[in-house]
Regions:
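Bacterial N-terminal signal peptides
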Residues: 5-15
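TPR-adjacent "capping" and linker segments in tetratricopeptide-repeat scaffold/adaptor proteins
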Residues: 28-44, 108-115
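Alpha-helical tetratricopeptide repeat
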Residues: 39-53, 80, 118-124, 158, ...
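Residue-level recognition of tetratricopeptide repeat
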Residues: 41, 75-76, 153-156, 194-196
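Inter-helical turn/loop elements of alpha-helical hairpins
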Residues: 55-63, 72, 82-117, 121-134, ...
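Conserved structural position within tetratricopeptide repeats
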Residues: 67-70, 107-108, 147-148, 189-190
Length: 218
């Protein structure tokens, strides 16, 4: 039953135009809910950027986050979003220098909500010092803590899932991490079928010959 369920979900997302990321419409990216301290206009751009991130549409994400900080120059999470858009874990790509330029603009985080502070502290680990794989693993642990701390935060679930997929590419526990990442993405789907991360992360999590049985009915 579980395998059939996964298979149906993947078919729905693969063949649904609603989830085509190369679109000019925010609605076609799906729906995300990520509360921040931003002004309303900046928040709208921020949400569009987050949805684009989950769709791997990084140029659009950069554009949206840049608009958000233009509307609200002190919007810390807008700079967080820009740094996130320079990290492409599934392709092992990262623009370390550009990301840190934007992260350096985040000053006093004590005025932010605790959740915002947690996200910013996590991304500072991602773009900290040291070997990239070590940073990736430490970031994934930080996102795991956020995921556990805020069990109703679907964005925490999504970004934790993605962090595991990034780490899985270079670890002996690859299949275990992919299954765990995929199961979390499926949980997101159950809570919000329109969330873009559910579609994309499930597909990438089970994109392996040894996991094909999870996506195909017996």
């Amino acid at each position: 039953m579980f395998r059939l369920f996964v298979f149906i979900i993947i078919l729905l997302f693969v063949h649904s135009d609603k989830y085509t990321y190369a679109s000019n419409s925010s609605e076609q990216l799906g729906s995300v809910n990520f509360s921040t301290s931003a002004s309303a206009p900046a928040q709208e751009q921020f949400l569009h950027g987050v949805a684009a991130l989950h769709s791997f549409w990084y140029t659009e994400a950069l554009s949206a986050f840049k608009k958000s900080i233009t509307l609200d120059p002190d919007f810390a999470m807008g700079y967080w979003g820009l740094a996130m858009a320079y990290n492409h874990p599934l392709w092992e790509e990262q623009d370390y220098e550009s990301a840190n330029i934007f992260l350096s603009k985040i000053k006093n985080i004590s005025k932010l909500t605790q959740k915002e502070q947690d996200y910013i502290q996590a991304i500072r680990i991602l773009y900290g010092t040291g070997d990239k794989l070590v940073r990736d693993k430490s970031y994934s642990k930080a996102m795991k803590n956020i995921y556990r701390k805020y069990p109703n935060d679907l964005e925490a679930a999504c970004f934790y899932s993605l962090s595991m997929l990034g780490v899985a590419r270079n670890t002996v526990n690859k299949l275990r991490l992919q299954v765990e990442a995929g199961s979390i993405a499926l949980e997101v789907f159950q809570k919000n079928p329109n969330h873009p991360c559910a579609a994309h992360y499930v597909i990438h999590a089970f994109d392996h010959p040894d996991l094909a049985r999870l996506a195909l009915p017996s």
